[in-house]
Structure formats: C-alpha cells, structure tokens
Amino acid sequence: MLSFLDNSSDEYLVGATYNKLYYVNPSHTVYDITPSGLTSGNLNGSLNLGYGGGFYGHDNYGSAPTSSGVYAEATTWSLDTWGEYLLACSSKDGKIYEWQLNTGVVAAQVSNAPVSNKGIVVTEERFVFALGAGGNPRKVAWCDQENNTSWTASATNQAGDFELQTTGQIMSGLRMRGRTLILTDNDAHVATYSGAPFVYGFERVGTACGLSSRKGAVAIDEGAFWMGKRGFFTFDGSVAKEINCEVSDYVFDDLNQSQISKVYAVHNSQHSEIWWFYPSGTSNENDRYVALDYKEGHWSTGELDRTAGVDSGVFTNPIWADASGNLYNQETGYTHGSTKPYAESGSISIGNGDSIMKVTQLIPDEKTQGQVEVTFKTRFYPNDTESTHGAFTLTNPTDVRFQGRQVRIKVQGTGNDNWRSGVMRIEASAGGRR
C-alpha cells in the first residue's frame, strides 16, 4: 500500500494484490489500474516439493522430496512516487509501470526500463533504482536523473548500474536522508550519491542481518527498522545492528516459515511504533503482530489480521488492510466488544531474586480512577506454578497482601473507556530467603 498527495494536494491511496493494482479515492470508489498483460503472481508462498526440487541425490529417484531448499515467495509490490505519478513493480512480473493519475487509463510500462526486476525505490536525488535488475539478484540499475526512460549509461547522462558484493539476493530498498539503504536476505548496503562519473557509491553496513520479506522493512526519520530471519535490526545511518527483543522466541518459534514472504512492516507515528504483521502457526495469512516502541524501547504482541498498511499523514489515521481486502481506519475510537485490552509486565524481583518480596499496598496512577483493574501473579521459583492475586478494583491507595520472589502485574480495562495508566508503585518489603 502507498498513500500520497498529487500536486493539487488531492489524496491518493494505492493497494495491490498478487495479480491486481488498485486506486481508492477519498470517496471509497475503487479503480482497477492493473497494467495490461501483467504476469499473475503467487497468492501464497510455497516450497518446491515436486520432481527435481531440493538437493541432487538427497531423495529417491522419481519421488517428490519431503523438503526443499527452493522457495517460491508470495508476490509483493514495490510502490513509490515519481513526482506526483505512481511507480509500481510486481516481484513476479518484474516490469516497472507508471500511472499518471488518470482513472480511465491503467498503469503503463516505463519505456526502456529493465525487466525481470524484484522491486524499485526512488532515491532522494530523483533516480529510479531497479532492484534485482534484469533478473540478476545482486544488481542495482538506475535511470538518468529526472528521466525514468533513459537507462543506458553514456557520457551525457547519469544512468548506470552496480552489482553488490553479496552472497544474498536484493530484497528491498529504502529511501533515507542522504542515502538509500539496500537490504538483501543476508546483509545491508548503503548507496550514496557522488555525482559523475560513478554517480553512486555502495558500501556494506551490516552482515548477518538479512531481511525476512520484501515488505518487512520501514524507514523513518530515526532510521530504518526491519525483521530478519531470527531477529530485528535497525540502521541509524552508520551501521546495522540487532535490536534487543524480549519476545523474539515467541515470534519466531511460531512464525509460519512457508509464508514468511508476507511479513509486512508499518510505521505508526502517532505512538512512535513499528508494527510487523506476520502469519503464525499454519496460517497462510498474517494473523499476529509484534510492535516496537522505538522511543521507549519496549515490545508488544497480539493477534490481528492485517496484511498491509500506511501511516497517517496523507490521511488523518493509519489505514490498514486485511486478507479479504477490507480497509480500516486504525486508531479510531476505543470500543472493543467483549475483548478487554490489557498491559502486562515482566517479572519484578528484589535484587537478584534471593529475597521474598512481601507486598502490602498498591498506589495506582490512572487517568480516571475505576477504569482499570489490577491482577498480580507471583512465583517463589522460576519454574514454579504462578499464583494469581486479584483482580483488585483500585482505590487510592489499594490494600493488597501477597508474597513471592517474582511478581508480575497485569492492568486491564473494565469497560469501553479510553483508559490510561501511568507508573504504578507498590509498597513492598524484603522477607527472608525461604
């Protein structure tokens, strides 16, 4: 998905499926702008388990292998703007298309542009980068500056190409301040504009930090964030580094690897968060999310069927989509039906946890008293069964009485209220070690 304004400040929302390209106007009218002759893509990712799949000599002759190193990814699109026009490239079709905002005319192939590409990104300097250009998974090709139909390098233009020194394949490109970040499934590279004669210089800025899916990365003012194959990474302009994540095992142990190409990252600037939608278990579609608050450095997880999205800015609210093609205005209202939203902490202990914590009182910090209830869960040993205390209806202060070496707190809304809770305090003392 992509949202943008034209030169008259009219709002545009563009979305794509594995075989279609759509424009949705502010009145919710949907226009099919799919290019003529588009090669239909793959709805789902799949392993090549047919005859000839996998490694030579691994299985019996004439039988389909039980596993394979060959993966056919679900089709995704690269969408970007060229001035006020739309540029689009399907990872399956590989051609670069331009749509000039005429709802009566579909997107058309850009003349002279390379084909068999895996994606595109428009740089800050107004070059179009074709990623995996011409079917070469490591090649970046670019057009002349301000001219997306001139791709053959000459002494009179700035078109060119470069093959990354990498063992991986290019997955995505992200426009950043003063540079363009190019992520492969193995490492990270930066392209920096230098002018003639080389036009762009390329530098590796990270290894063992490959991108999990073509839509699994997002760039914001603070830097770039992406989901890898077994961790999360960020690039702040100098070097790529892994982000400490307390829920990493929870996410990756349950991620459906056969549909990992559907992982989608969105920025929620209203709350300084990066969300990743991903398919869990045996689900073919994204049904869960993991989110990072990049200012406070904490993580959250949950269940939500969203496949793509755009941040607020062009539109008042973020707009996210589900697998059925429904569009949602996110961050609107706070009714939640029978489901009660909650926040839950990790384990709290005194020092290194040798002493028992005796808790006698809770001092709440609510926006409006009475809109939340609090439950405590305690353990005496890390592998012990948890004991539950509460739920407590909060007063100021709230008397409680329990003990344990490890204590967790759960704050849960009691109704359809716009509740907010700050930093609560507990009155506790250290007991013995037994």
Model-inferred region functions:
Residues 9-10, 83, 125, 177:
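Conserved loop/turn motif of beta-propeller repeat scaffolds
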Residues 22, 87, 97, 129, ...:
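Conserved hydrophobic/aromatic positions in well-ordered beta-strands
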Residues 14-17, 88-91, 130-133, 182-184, ...:
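Conserved beta-strand positions in repeat-built beta-propeller and related beta-rich domains
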Residues 82-108:
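Hydrophobic or amphipathic alpha-helical targeting/insertion segments
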Residues 2-34, 38, 51-60, 76-81, ...:
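Beta-sheet repeat architectures centered on beta-propellers
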Residues 80-83, 88-89, 123-129:
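Hydrophobic alpha-helical hairpins/lids featuring a short glycine-rich hinge
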